[in-house]
Amino acid sequence: MKKIAVSAIALTIAAVGFASVAQAQQLAQPAGKLFFEGDIVRHALPNQAGPFCVLVNQYKRGEAVAFRIRTLLPNGQIADDKAIKSLVVELGNGQRLPAGYKPHGAPPTDFFWSFFWTIPADHPTGSIGYKVIATMNDGSTVEWKPFNRATTALMVVAGEPEMKK
């Protein structure tokens, strides 16, 4: 009987402790917090050979990187252009590139934020850091950065894009 009473007290204390932790986690999420999903794929440019819309992290000067970003609210709902005022990708050099929320596929099968950036002919080789900045309708901002691993980062490599034959 004594063991049961002690077990019941311990269980009650544990349950109250876990409830407090869960409540603290809920309170720690400020309004406007987002979850990000994203990738980069090779974007089709005229006369280039492709393949396109494939996941790659190494690009040659003159090739185009397509940034694809999905944003979710804490409740799991999509954060579209009605929930977010603007979404930009800021490259490591400070250049900001705006994304648009639009359908993708023909016919459209998905909606997400996207844009493409053609790597300039004079861009230095090496990895390019970037981050995504979402500005909410209330003016607050939320940032996301991809993994910080040089081998998987967006990278400019030497060479010319392969052209159609």
Where are the predicted features?
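Bacterial N-terminal signal peptides that target proteins for export
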Residues: 1-9
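C-terminal segment of classical bacterial N-terminal signal peptides
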Residues: 14-23
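Beta-strand-rich domain onsets/edges
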Residues: 25-66, 70-72, 159-165
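Short flexible loop/turn segments that cap and initiate beta-strands
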Residues: 59, 63, 72-100, 130
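Hydrophobic beta-strand positions in extracellular immunoglobulin-like domains
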Residues: 71, 117-119, 134
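Aromatic sugar-binding surface patches on proteins
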Residues: 107-118, 124
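Internal, hydrophobic beta-strand segments that form the core of beta-sheet-rich folds
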Residues: 122-148
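Short beta-strand elements
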Residues: 140-165
